[in-house]
Amino acid sequence: MPVRNYEISLTETQALKGIAIIAMLVHHLFYTTMQYGALVNHIGWIGKVCVAIFLFLSGYGLTFQYMRNTYNSTARGTLKFLYRRFVKFYLNYWFVFLIAVPLGVFAFGRTLDQPYGTDTNHWLMLLTDFLGLNDVYSYNITWWFNRLIIIFYLLFPILFRLTAYKPLVLLSLPIAYLEPSFCPFYFGIVVSRYRENVNTFLNRLPAWSIVLMAAVMAILLCFVRELSDIPFLHGTNIDALTTLCLALLIVGWANVRPTDYRLLTYLGKHSMNMYLVHTFIFLYFFSDFIYQFRYPVLIVLALLLTSLALSIVIEQLKKVLSFYKFQDYLLHKL
């Protein structure tokens, strides 16, 4: 029997990002309102799993890249690794920041008083926001995620070394589960580091049973997330487990029926830009336009298409300005 590959490929990573960005839009559109009914509100809350998916993929991807080169295990190698990661993150964030903030202030009237308050030093707040450190007090409230991922990037070398000891991993996993933000990132590191062991184990099971089990568990966990009152088995605590099931479903299905997940991967490639801009569209500047479509599916589709269109424009602008050439220059500078 041929050996199946259950490692998460780049295509499958992008597909999962595509799922995550759709979940993010659904979450932000509906989690604060009962206007469209209780079911839609619950689905909006379930969409919060997007955070866990992005964190899991970050932990998995960082570990995969880190292990590809033994030079990374040296102090200089680790610094170079983090430098390259931060260059990619900050350049893409700053590109949108430097367009969106001036445009928001001067064209749409979203002054700095609104996100930063009237009793703060706006220049200092703008600087810390530019560095991705403002949490929910960012010019765009959705950018709170920036500070979280920056912290995890800095912690990554330490966490990677801790996962070298299997007994410590087994002891730490239940503890990690107690912290909803940390858990998926740490799970990503562990799964990636021991992906050969995971692959060996999954190859002992029938391919279809893995897909079926992952699908059933993902659906069940969504119900449990919203309906359970059991401590640590509801809300964001359970999102890391749901993410594992979704990842297994995507990878498992690719082993049963080879697919390139074309639509999801396309969205995944634009997920960073869509994350950075979608709140400007549906919350700050064009709320009436998005919600005028009345039906939840159409509302999501409207935000999805407008966010995607804006991302495409951003990518075209990057090409015109030789953004990626400049990024490559900086990546190879150190």
Predicted regions: what they are:
Residues M1-P174, I210, P258, Y266, ...:
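Membrane-cytosol interface segments of multi-pass membrane proteins
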Residues R4, E179-Y275, F280-D288, F293-A302:
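Alpha-helical transmembrane segments and terminal signal-anchor/GPI-anchor hydrophobic tails
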